[in-house]
């Protein structure tokens, strides 16, 4: 069984991930993982944190000469923003934000300072999940299994994949889009919805679609 564990706080020194259960002998490269991290950072509507971080993975165990050893794989991603927070004396955070883990987390862990919850439930944690997912994606390519995810809806705009492009061409279009939607026209309209919502200080709902090719029936 393959398992993974992540640790680290949003404004701590680093994020850490451990993966166990992967077999030995599979090609896994830092460059492939970093390409996923770079795609994660490019989307329109991302917060100011993306201007501070320049994510690159550090592989400290489980991969030697770009091959998995069969032992646990340990990954690290540095938080550049840590230096801006490490010496600050910060007052407790006591007002929960709607739609976040703040309220549930404080109830579960009996926390008096919401910062103890938000540091772990921050979207920053998904950087490590992205790196771990990249390893899985690269290993699956050995079996001619390819995966592509794209944004299929933002606000009132929706895109439905017709299946006319190969999955690699689809991924190229997704990568070129500022909103990760493979249709140029709909991408522009999604961009406009995001900009309008920002101006109104509002939020938008959205949806994603994931496609896999080569999966055995």
Q: Can you say where each PLM-predicted feature lies in the sequence?
A:
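Generic N-terminal targeting/processing segments that precede catalytic cores or assembly contacts
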Residues: 1-126, 130-217
